[in-house]
Amino acid sequence: MKIVVAGGRDEADFLIGLLLMGKHKLITVNEDMNYCEHLAAVHDDISVIYGDPCKEYVMEDAGIRGCDIVIALREKDADNLEICQMAKRLFAVKKTVCTVRNPKNVEIFELLGVDRAISATYMLAHYIEQASVVEDLVKVMPLENQRVLVNEIRVMSDCPAVGRKIA
């Protein structure tokens, strides 16, 4: 896949390393010259573009048109939304992903066309919520040999199984 990583530092470094293991073609766009020099020195198999990924001409010059995925990792949520919307609307990018600092922006960004908005706080809150539900289940379930098996199956809202008891 052809993937663009826009912005970021530590998270971009980690992500680039993982994506390179998957043999993806990577383009990085970053406005920090020192970071771009670092990336170019460490990775000879990626395109490193120095410039502001919020600028249309920078992304045009980077050659992102028709890419499979754009991943926006800027500090400001608004920048990440702008990058993702620009990628979809102007450059026909198939999928957009971004990080968000404010967990309230996850659902808003997805409503505004970002394919996946990721917030560590949002994910942690959902994990805690799910863990507490499982803990409550375990407290009321009779245990056989101190073992419990809990399965979760997600179904579409129009599935005939919705609201029905499954044995």
Language model features by range: what are they?
Residues M1-A167:
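Cytosolic regulatory regions of ion transport systems
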